[in-house]
């Protein structure tokens, strides 16, 4: 999808229309704009709790993608007989009133420009053959990529942008939560749902905006935050990048756009190619500005000493599992301290943070089996997540780690086949399904069975179950009391957790 808009994004009252509004990144932006009392509409082929939440704050949702959707706000002025639904643009005004406000230029936020065609927002997932997209071009609507809207929001705030191949969602959520608990009331836009604000976005009244900024399609270079964080850099998204050098160049450009860059020294690529203003590390790099020392790894979390430039600030409890989440918490400490927060305030917030959905999220228990949903879909993410799970077994909380993994994208599976083959060393049993295409073609002629064979060369207990629906019959036969069953992947495997749970009862 290409942006064809010329000029700045208009936040003064011109409507926004999102193509694929139910997506995790699109919906967060739509929510913030709707909460700002801007006219928001969008289309999505599926009705979900995410689209329901958007409707609850006034967005108009269409369940088809046709050019006529783009005329919605203009149509309000020619059909004044019907009242707006409660909470819709105009805050419950009749259509006559919103039409009048459009001509007079007045509403609760200043102006509604409903006489204008909307600003259309797309993500990379929308292809140029999409009928609604083609309609937007034909109607000469300004068309923006999702990242253009986020970049504009960051630019008008004191922006804090969290980048990195892994850990963006948890780190940005942690930072947002710390600032919120400290009373700074930031606006938060992240790529996962968080119970603390009951969704993937929160509109605050403060001057800060905390956002997860994405490198997957190269749009990271659009952002100019006051504070940037880079958690790590690795080759991923082989559908967009051919080499690690291409990824590094994107991050170097992002670094040049940040007033202050905070970077993790535990990543060799960050050490070699970036020059962060502020650094953090676990116990490996004593030169880091922020360090975690004396790590006590426990079944219910980790306790660490936090050091700031050679001075011990105190201890911190990280309830999220795994060393990677200690690292994510250190990034939040670094941001909080940069903003002048006292360490006890930061530590208390981190200790009470319960994480984001689909990040080691407990989905239920049955007959001594614990069911976990996790978004891990890259070999490094699998290694970190399974190491965290194994830590819980080591401390006696569970007896076995069972990894149920749905590979995500043919290109990723093909590119990282060797790395995937050794990524399951901390699992006692591995169950692999067929590959979730995410809309990709398969020029590699690769299947999940190929990955199962590769993993089987390094692991003695691998089962290939290609069809997701077959898991409902298979897993209850092999799962046993004391198992920690992890459903892993960025596709739709998580939709099988509830049926498997029910089948185990």
UniProtKB/Swiss-Prot annotation:
Tell me where it resides.
Answer: Cytoplasm
Residue ranges the record marks as coiled coil: none
Query: Mind telling me which SUPFAM superfamilies this protein's record contains?
Result: MurCD N-terminal domain, MurD-like peptide ligases, catalytic domain, MurD-like peptide ligases, peptide-binding domain
Q: What is this protein called?
A: UDP-N-acetylmuramate--L-alanine ligase
Q: Report the sequence similarity comment from the record.
A: Belongs to the MurCDEF family.
- In short, the EC number is 6.3.2.8
Record's function text: Cell wall formation.
What is any one GO biological process for this UniProt entry? Answer: cell wall organization
- Its EC top class is ligase
Upper taxonomic lineage: Bacteria, Bacillati, Cyanobacteriota, Cyanophyceae, Synechococcales
According to UniProt, this protein's pathway is:
Cell wall biogenesis; peptidoglycan biosynthesis
Q: Name one Pfam family in it.
A: Mur_ligase_C
> Its GO CC terms?
cytoplasm
Chain sites annotated for binding ATP: 164-170
Chemical reaction(s) catalysed: UDP-N-acetyl-alpha-D-muramate + L-alanine + ATP = UDP-N-acetyl-alpha-D-muramoyl-L-alanine + ADP + phosphate + H(+)
Q: Which HAMAP family match?
A: MurC
User: Which UniProt keyword terms apply here?
Assistant: ATP-binding, Cell cycle, Cell division, Cell shape, Cell wall biogenesis/degradation, Cytoplasm, Ligase, Nucleotide-binding, Peptidoglycan synthesis
User: What molecular functions are annotated in GO for this chain?
Assistant: ATP binding; UDP-N-acetylmuramate-L-alanine ligase activity
């Amino acid at each position: 999808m290409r942006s064809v808009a010329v000029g700045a994004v208009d936040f003064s009252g011109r409507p926004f229309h999102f193509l694929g509004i139910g997506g995790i990144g699109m919906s967060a932006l739509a929510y913030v704009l709707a909460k700002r009392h801007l006219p928001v509409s969008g289309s999505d082929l599926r009705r979900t709790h995410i689209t329901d939440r958007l409707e609850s704050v006034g967005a108009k949702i269409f369940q088809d993608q046709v050019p006529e959707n783009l005329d919605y706000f203009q149509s309000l002025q020619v059909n004044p007989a019907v009242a707006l639904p409660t909470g819709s643009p105009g805050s419950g005004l009749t259509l006559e009133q919103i039409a009048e406000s459009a001509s007079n230029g007045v509403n609760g936020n200043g102006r509604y420009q409903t006489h204008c065609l909307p600003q259309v927002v797309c993500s990379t997932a929308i292809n140029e053959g999409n009928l609604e997209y083609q309609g937007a071009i034909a109607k000469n609507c300004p068309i923006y990529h999702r990242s253009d809207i986020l970049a504009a929001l960051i630019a008008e705030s004191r922006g804090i942008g969290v980048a990195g191949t892994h850990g963006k969602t948890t780190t940005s959520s942690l930072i947002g939560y710390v600032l919120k608990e400290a009373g700074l009331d930031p606006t938060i836009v992240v790529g996962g749902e968080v119970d603390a604000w009951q969704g993937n976005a929160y509109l605050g009244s403060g001057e800060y905006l905390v956002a997860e900024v994405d490198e997957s399609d190269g749009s990271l270079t659009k952002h100019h935050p006051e504070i940037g964080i880079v958690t790590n850099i690795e080759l991923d998204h082989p559908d967009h990048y051919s080499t690690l050098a291409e990824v590094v160049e994107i991050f170097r450009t992002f670094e040049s756009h940040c007033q202050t860059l905070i970077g993790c020294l535990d990543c060799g690529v960050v050490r070699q190619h970036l020059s962060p203003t502020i650094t953090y590390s676990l116990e490996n790099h004593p030169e880091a500005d922020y360090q975690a020392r004396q790590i006590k790894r426990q079944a219910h979390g980790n306790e660490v000493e936090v050091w700031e430039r050679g001075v011990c600030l105190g201890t911190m409890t990280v309830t999220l599992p795994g060393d990677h989440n200690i690292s994510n918490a250190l990034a939040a400490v670094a941001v909080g301290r940069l903003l002048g927060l006292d360490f006890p305030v930061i530590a208390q917030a981190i200790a009470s943070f319960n994480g984001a959905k689909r990040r080691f999220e407990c989905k239920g228990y049955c007959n001594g089996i614990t069911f976990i949903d996790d978004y891990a879909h890259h070999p490094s993410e699998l290694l970190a997540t399974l190491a965290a799970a194994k830590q819980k077994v080591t401390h006696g909380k569970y007896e076995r780690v069972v990894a149920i993994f749905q590979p995500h994208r043919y290109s990723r599976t093909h590119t990282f086949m060797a790395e995937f083959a050794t990524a399951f060393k901390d699992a006692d049993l591995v169950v692999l399904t067929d590959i979730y295409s995410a809309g990709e073609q398969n020029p590699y002629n690769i299947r999940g069975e190929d990955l199962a064979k590769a993993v089987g060369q390094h692991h003695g207990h691998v089962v290939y179950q290609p069809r997701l629906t077959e898991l409902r019959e298979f897993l209850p036969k092999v799962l046993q009391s004391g198992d920690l069953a992890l459903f892993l992947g960025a596709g739709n495997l998580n939709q099988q957790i509830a049926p498997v749970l029910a089948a185990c009862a």
